[in-house]
Amino acid sequence: MDLSIPNPVADTTKAADAGTAGGQPLEIDALIVGAGPVGLFQVFELGLLEIKAHVIDSLKVVGGQCVELYPDKPIYDIPAVPSCTGQELTDNLLKQIEPFGPTFHLGQEVAVVERRDDGRFFVETSLGTRFITKTIFIAAGVGSFQPRTLKVDGIDKFDGKQLFYRVKDPSRFHGRNLVIVGGGDSALDWTLDLVGKAESVVMIHRRDGFRAAPASVAKMKELCEQMEMQFLVGQIGGYEEKDGVLTEIKVTGADGVTRRLPVDDVLVFFGLSPKLGPIAEWGLDLERKQIKVDTEKFQTNIPGIFAVGDINTYPGKKKLILSGFHEAALAAFGAAPYIFPEKKIHMQYTTTSPKLHKVLGVESPVFD
């Protein structure tokens, strides 16, 4: 599935939002905030309990940080999957949740959350989509995330034209004179990827020390020795332009000397600045911009609101996709009594349960 044109997801978004913006709220059982891997797996775990979910995300595509920041980088710590990219993980999760028919509401944030007298929540998004829901699952990763920007007066006018903080189409930089700024894994990874494809690559970092894999640093230094690229210790302090086109940047080195480098594109990787956004105003118990939860149900201090994935915190928390999947399973069971208060939930297994096979749309195996 090409998530740059997410047809089935887009269709559910349009159909749902067209019917609710300014009209009657959708009355639902579960609302998931965040369409990254953990949010998608939350759909699956709820679906096994016959709970249909609606999913909101501020991005216009499904996949969260995996698709937005590293769609082509391999992930090695998903159980039984030796290696997959962020895009492949997202595609597989979308396939896995197909039987449950989730409805996606993309390109919008939750703006209002109010507790109703009947115990349910009224929720409204930034686009006016409204819900009345029994439960809320916050799977928003680090919240809304923004790249830390290059602090040079006036250079922001080239943002998205010749100044980039993310790489979505690597081929766009082939045959170009590139300056890559930063000292972390992203800066090193893209430097190594683009050397030999770009016309020239100059990497700039404020010091001769890196927060990246040692093998990547060693490879970069080897390429410098082979005259395949350059590395400069320094900081960008200015630029030159001609007819509205960025033509040079000015780099001041540790020796105090300012050098001028011809450039077609500047790629900046200073990391991300996470922002909780409207979630910070919901009355949740927060600790250092993360939501405190229990470890039995991964419920917040507000009954009926759960938090899973990187956005939550508890003693021993590890920010792993694997951990988020575990949290989603327990959160689904924790939410079931709010949705089916009279129903006793029995533990069933997808290997043996005819009921789950029916829910999943698969045939029950027959054993001799």
Curated annotation (Swiss-Prot):
Similarity comment text for this entry: Belongs to the ferredoxin--NADP reductase type 2 family.
Keyword terms, alphabetized: FAD, Flavoprotein, NADP, Oxidoreductase
One of the Pfam families matching this protein, by short name: Pyr_redox_2
Protein name, per record: Ferredoxin--NADP reductase 2
Gene Ontology MF: a single term: flavin adenine dinucleotide binding
Assembly: Homodimer.
Cofactor(s) listed: FAD
UniProt keyword Lipid biosynthesis present: no
Amino acids binding FAD: 57, 65, 70, 110, 145, 310, 351
Enzyme Commission identifier(s): 1.18.1.2
InterPro entries recorded: FAD/NAD-bd_sf, FAD/NAD-binding_dom, Fd--NADP_Rdtase_type_2, Ferredoxin-NADP_redctase_2
UniProt catalytic activity: 2 reduced [2Fe-2S]-[ferredoxin] + NADP(+) + H(+) = 2 oxidized [2Fe-2S]-[ferredoxin] + NADPH
Cofactor binding, note field: Binds 1 FAD per subunit.
